[in-house]
Amino acid sequence: MLITLLTIFHHTSSAQRDPQLREALSTMTKASISGDIEGILSQTSPRIIESMGGIEQATKVTKELYSSLIKYGVKIDSMINYVDMDISKIDGIAYCFIPQVLVMSMPEKDKMAITSANLLALKEDDTKKWTFFNFNKMNQEMINMFLPEFNGKISLPPDLEKKTLVVGKEEVAKTVDHLMKLIDESVKKHH
């Protein structure tokens, strides 16, 4: 648990300058690690929940996702958020991209799975709170559908290679460090 907390707050920056965003991200991270479906959905963009068919359907789908992870012996162990990203605004919507590294335990007790993910933090004028939008499996077209205000105004940050690495437990810290450096380089290159 301590390692998780240390890694969550490992990087400080502009997103950290918005205490409301930092708090919402911390809540989302803790909920994702513990499998707290209600907590996850309370931090999820209403646009996503609506697109899933409302809160009941979103709850059902999210529960199924977590159940299938458990069934396959996979558990999110920690999430490391790269928060050195600028907060921007379009049409009354503040937003910030947050690359993440996820570390998951697997059925093979001596192995861990590590992958990268992308969150989009949104703060819309009508909600007045930060919510999140996981755009991992989305292309620019899908983003434009969910956020027509962004159409033609922003493009998705370049993806890291989307593969899941399986490493021995002793290699986790080194691998996470390497991925965070890749994210850092990618972010700096495209700013």
Question: At which residue positions do the language-model features occur?
Answer:
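Short solvent-exposed beta->alpha transition segments
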Residues: R22, G39-D91, Y95
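Cleaved targeting-peptide boundary
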Residues: S14-A24, K189-H191
